[in-house]
Amino acid sequence: GHGQDDFVRILAGVAHAYKGFTQVSINHGNDYFSIKSLEEAQKHEIAFVSGDRKREGILPNLSIKENLAISMYGNHSKVPGVRFIEWNAINDIVDWEVERLAIKTGPIENLITSLSGGNQQKVMLGRAFATHPKILVLLDPARGIDLQTKRDLYKQLRDFADAGYSVIYMSSELEEFIGFCSRVIVFRN
């Protein structure tokens, strides 16, 4: 590769740069922040979705609902400093993401491994959306999913971008950029 996977992982805070640093410009270049960890990326409302859902996405021993909700861990606690999952507060968000992303789940308490690969990937996208990110970083998210699920994915990402948020999408498939991206960066050498 040419470093594009590493770049995306560093930007999302899931990997560390061996040297140098990563800065994200905001407010039309008038301000910036650095990313040194996943916690810093999350603090700045950056979410990450990998195309390798088996290694970097699904938690196979958890239910569909738990896989969607895990990103909200602590975000809905009514007691400051207490980090636990409040299912009453989270159920509505989980139901909304399942409906919005048209995830074909069956009973939501089933293990996530009961879903097709495309629906597992939709759960990963829903998990990211549930954190209300301003920047969504995706690393080859359409890898190994069917054509209709790809179309659904692209529509959700376009809607997210049209709402004023940023999508950073890494792919090695040129066709994925046509009609989808406003800017393309090519990594070479």
Predicted regions and their residues:
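Conserved P-loop NTPase catalytic core
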Residues: 8-115
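Hydrophobic anchor residue at the start of the ABC signature
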Residues: 125
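A short, proline-enriched helix->beta-strand linker immediately N-terminal to the Walker B motif
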Residues: 130-134
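ABC-family nucleotide-binding domains
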Residues: 139, 146
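Helical segment within the ABC ATPase nucleotide-binding domain
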Residues: 151-163
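H-loop/switch region of ABC-family ATPase nucleotide-binding domains
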Residues: 171-172
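A short, surface-exposed alpha-helical micro-motif characterized by mixed small hydrophobic
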Residues: 177-179
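Short, glycine/charged-rich "phosphate-handling" switch motifs in NTP-dependent
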Residues: 183
